[in-house]
Structures are given as C-alpha cells and as structure tokens.
Amino acid sequence: APAMGFQGVR
C-alpha cells in the first residue's frame, strides 16, 4: 500500500 497522502495513487 502507498504512503499516507498517496492513498489515491496506487
């Protein structure tokens, strides 16, 4: 999973 703040960008 991506880092926090980049949840929309996988």
UniProtKB/Swiss-Prot annotation:
Biological-process GO terms, alphabetical: neuropeptide signaling pathway
Entry-annotated residues carrying Arginine amide: R10
GO CC entries: extracellular region
Expression (tissue specificity): Midgut and brain.
Subcellular location: Secreted
Keyword field: Amidation, Neuropeptide, Secreted
Pfam family, one: Lem_TRP
Main location: secreted
Task of the protein: Myoactive peptide. Increases the amplitude and frequency of spontaneous contractions and tonus of hindgut muscle.
The protein's name in its UniProt record: Tachykinin-related peptide 5
Organism for this UniProt entry: Rhyparobia maderae
Taxonomic lineage of the native organism: Eukaryota, Metazoa, Ecdysozoa, Arthropoda, Hexapoda
